Regions:
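Short low-complexity stretches enriched in small and charged residues
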Residues: 5-12, 20, 41-46, 70, ...
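Glycine-rich beta-strand-turn "strand-cap" elements at beta-sheet edges
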Residues: 40-45, 73-103
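Intrinsically disordered, low-complexity acidic/polar segments
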Residues: 15-17, 49, 61, 99
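Acidic-enriched, low-complexity/disordered segments with a strong bias for Aspartate over Glutamate
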Residues: 16, 33, 45-49, 54, ...
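Short, well-ordered beta-strand segments in beta-rich or mixed alpha/beta enzyme
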Residues: 2-8, 39-66
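N-terminal first-folded block
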Residues: 2-32, 36
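An amphipathic, aromatic/His-enriched active-site/gating alpha helix that lines ligand/cofactor pockets
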Residues: 24-36, 55-89
Length: 103
């Protein structure tokens, strides 16, 4: 498993554009193999701060995701409307429970 937590901050007045771009990425991942979790969130106390949690079944799945046309189109556009704050590689452990929202 390969997991990452990415933090980005929308540039002033660009929050809606960040949401539009990332929502498009989320739709794309529904068709990709090897992505177990792909969650986008904002901070409750700072709605211009975005946190993206990705969990891939393998390094190959992550590499394949980053090679998609959608990823290659979205990332440069996203960097125009948001600042990259940081990314943390995570080491998942223990059992996972995933329940889709609204289930």
């Amino acid at each position: 498993m390969h997991a990452f937590l990415t933090h980005m901050r929308a540039k002033p007045g660009k929050r809606d554009e960040v949401i539009r771009l990332t929502t498009g990425m989320l739709e794309q991942t529904q068709t990709e193999d090897g992505i177990s979790i792909y969650v986008f969130s904002t901070a409750k106390d700072s709605p211009d701060d975005f946190y993206f949690y990705d969990l891939y079944e393998s390094e190959e799945a992550r590499t394949a995701h980053e090679a998609t046309e959608k990823f290659k189109e979205t990332m440069p556009a996203l960097m125009q409307v948001a600042d990259f704050v940081g990314v943390t590689a995570l080491e998942p452990y223990g059992p996972m429970k995933i329940t889709p929202p609204g289930s």
